[in-house]
Structures are given as structure tokens and as C-alpha cells.
């Protein structure tokens, strides 16, 4: 039930973002439409641990609160398979923050670095890998 609720909330957030211009694709590279995605990846490996419940209910909401109105929405992925169902998962989890201003994101994280970093040990023994991307386009499936 909780998984369905999270999925519905994610869909609501996505369509809320996309509904601003439902008649066209949103090109984030256009002035005023900038959107950045900060991906936090937790690689799988021998001896790696990850408490998804804590990450979902405590860590990500705490960091989201630090980002204020700059945060558009966030996502949490739980790895379930690799390239094929038999392959090990490459990442135990991936968290995403979608923000309008990457400088404001960096400032908020820098100002709260100790709180964010010190909380990591509460849910994992993995050193996360961070990637910042510019979202270039958000499209909806026209076949539906």
C-alpha cells in the first residue's frame, strides 16, 4: 500500500510539473525553464548495506527540507536488478533532487554539510557518487 502511495505521489509530482505546458514538450534549456537533477548513487558491492526505510522516511525528507522552494520534487529508486534479472544490481539505491537553481542547491548543502554527511552513517556504509545534470527535456508518452 505504501509503495502504491509513493508511486501515486511521484506521478502527481511529475504531472504537476509537466502540466504547466501540457500541449508541448518542456525544453529545459530555454531561458527560465532551467531544471537540474542531482543524482546520489549508492553503488552495490560486497559488504555494502543500505537501510531504505530510513533513507525514505528520514534522510531524504530532511535534505529536501533544507532545499526550500528551490526544490521542485525528489525521487528515490530502489535497485531491483541489473541489465538482466540474473545480473546483480549496480546500485542499491539512487536519490534524485530536481532543483531550479544549482547555485542555491550548492549553497543550501554547503550550509548544512555536517548535518547531511553525519546522517549518512545512519542508513549506509556506502560512499555515495554524486552527478549533477541539466534536464534537457521532459516528454510524455504520446501513445497513451
How would you name each of these model-derived features?
Residues 1-28:
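Bacterial Sec-dependent N-terminal signal peptides
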Residues 20-144:
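Macromolecular interaction modules
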Amino acid at each position: 500500500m505504501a509503495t502504491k502511495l509513493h508511486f501515486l505521489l511521484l506521478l502527481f509530482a511529475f504531472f504537476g510539473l509537466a502540466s504547466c505546458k501540457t500541449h508541448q514538450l518542456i525544453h529545459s534549456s530555454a531561458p527560465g525553464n532551467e531544471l537540474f537533477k542531482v543524482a546520489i548513487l549508492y553503488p552495490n558491492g560486497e559488504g555494502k548495506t543500505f537501510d531504505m526505510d530510513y533513507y525514505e522516511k528520514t534522510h531524504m525528507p530532511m535534505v529536501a527540507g533544507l532545499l526550500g522552494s528551490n526544490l521542485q520534487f525528489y525521487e528515490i529508486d530502489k535497485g531491483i536488478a541489473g541489465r538482466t534479472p540474473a545480473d546483480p544490481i549496480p546500485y542499491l539505491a539512487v536519490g534524485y533532487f530536481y532543483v531550479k537553481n544549482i547555485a542555491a542547491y550548492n549553497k543550501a548543502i554547503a550550509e548544512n554539510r555536517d548535518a547531511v554527511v553525519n546522517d549518512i552513517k545512519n542508513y549506509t556504509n556506502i560512499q555515495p557518487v554524486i552527478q549533477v545534470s541539466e534536464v534537457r527535456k521532459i516528454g510524455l508518452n504520446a501513445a497513451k
